[in-house]
Structures are given as structure tokens and as C-alpha cells.
Amino acid sequence: MGDQEVANRYEKLTPMFFLMKKLADLLRSKRKKRGSVDFDFPESKILLDKEGRPIKIMPYERNAATNIIEDFMLLANETVAQHFYWMEVPFVYRTHDKPDPDKIMQLAAFINNFGYHIKVKSGENEVHPKEIQKLLAEIEGRPQEALISRLALRSMKRARYSTECTGHFGLACQYYCHFTSPIRRYPDLQIHRIIKEQLRGRLKEERIQHYQEILTEVAKHSSEMERRADDAERETEKLKKVQYMKSRIGQSFEGVISGVTAWGIYVELPDTVEGMIHVSRLYGDFYFYREETYEMVGRDTGKCFKLGQKVKIVVDGVDELQKSIDFVLAPEEEDQ
């Protein structure tokens, strides 16, 4: 179906779509002003054949519709959380505590090496989410963006479910819950049950006591299951990428250096696949790791590999058990 055919089919709804887009932009702007933090990491879209083998990998592209749904979803979650907080009934909130002060100081010290700064509350080592937001805006498009974004994310505490409404640091809001996906998340389903009982006038003292008894364990168990699901998703994605690159051993690709460590350099390809060139496979010189600038430097030649640098690689091998991909520099890169 072509674009024009789609436009004709939904012609009556088009004005509403544009109104939704306008409202979503206002909501996003409002969240940004209060300091909401958006870690925009590239996501992978992996296409599989009937046997579950990966046949294509590409970056997942967000569009206007994606943003509209997200903005409306966030508002619905905030509204429901605030409404039921003031009703003073047992509930399951989605909370995100303030970052650990030590991790914030470590982040501040690290980004200082690259000329970036965040304002930390004196004496308490606390940071406002707006400072993290400003940092992410500053590094956007810079060579250090991926590294600093990952380190900033690691300095944050993990969001969790709780019966206490303690606020959400990342969204810079006081009230938040997960309400919009009862078909795939248990906390949402639990919330819908509470709402239905309240709407139907059945949330009497006996039912309130029931929820008071079970919701703490519901929140704890849901948080634990979420962590397990996230870990499984990450491991599965890594495995599918390894399987995808297995049939491409010996092929060359252009990529960008996404990480530098004492043991090698990581290179990310345009399709989001990442592999490592071990330091022992950097030929032509003895390379050492310059920690303060995250660079790999040749002792004799002074040749330098740094974050954001474009390089051409050859897929050297994969390890399905370790879920790792090994690259080597393409011959033309070594000759430079």
C-alpha cells in the first residue's frame, strides 16, 4: 500500500493525527523543561526466518507515531499514579531513586577529562536530573557520546516497583506507575484490578487489607522478574548478532570505534553489531592504553585509535558460547 493510498484511506482521521502530534510535542517540551532524562541508545531490529535464524539486522527507527504513543503513555501513567496516590489506597508505583552520590562524583570526575561538567549540590553530592539532561544534549553527535551516555546510565539507580510513591528521578516527576500495558506487564494488570474494584465500588476495607498484604511482594517479585527478562533479552540479542555475523566471517565493513579498553578497541557497525579488535591483533607497533583520554596509542608510530573514529574492519571470528564477535583491522587500515 503506497503513501497516497494510506493517506486517502485515513483522510477523515488526518486532522486528529496532526492534533495528536501537536499535543505530544507540547508534552515532550513540558517534560524537558522539568528535567526529564532521555537516554536515546540505538536499538536493534533483528529479522528472523521461519527457523529463527537472523537474516537481517538494522537500527530500530523511531517515528512520529512512536513518539506520540510514548508521550501519551507517559501522561496516562503519571495521571493514574497521582490520582490513586491522593485516594490513599494500596497501589503499585514505578519509582526511580536518586543516583548514588559516589557514582555521581565518579561520573563528574570522568567527564571532566573531556571538558564536560555537571553541577553537583555542594555537601550532599546530589545532582538534579536536568544536569544529566544537559550533559546528554552537550555530547550529542560527539565522539564520546556513546561512552559517556553509557557511564551516565550506569551512575543511575535501577527503576523498580514499589508500594511507596517516592518519585521518578529519570522522568523528573513525583507520581508514576505502569498502567498502560496490562496484557504484557503484571504490575499494570494488578493496577487495573484495583481500578476496576474502585470504579465498581468494591474497594471496601476487606479488599484494601487484601491489597495491603500482597502488594509489597507483588512489587518485589515484579522487579526481580523484570531484571531477569531484561537480562534474557540482552543475551538473546547478543546471540542472534553472533549467529548473523558467523556467515560473514572474512567480510569487511566500515564502523565506528565505540569503546577503548586496555585489552582492545570495540567497533560498532551501522547495523548496531559490535565486535572487538584485541590489542594483540593491532599490528605494526606496540599499542598501549591511554586511560585519561580513552585512546589506544602506538608507542613508536604515535598512531592513535580513539572514540568516534571511523575504521574498516574484517570479521575474524565469532564465539557463540561467549556471545562475542572478533574483528581485525582491514589491510588498508593497517597500511595507513
Stretches with model-predicted labels:
Residues 1-283, 293, 308, 314, ...:
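Electropositive polyanion-binding surfaces
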Residues 284-305:
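Surface-exposed acidic, glycine/proline-enriched linker/cap segments
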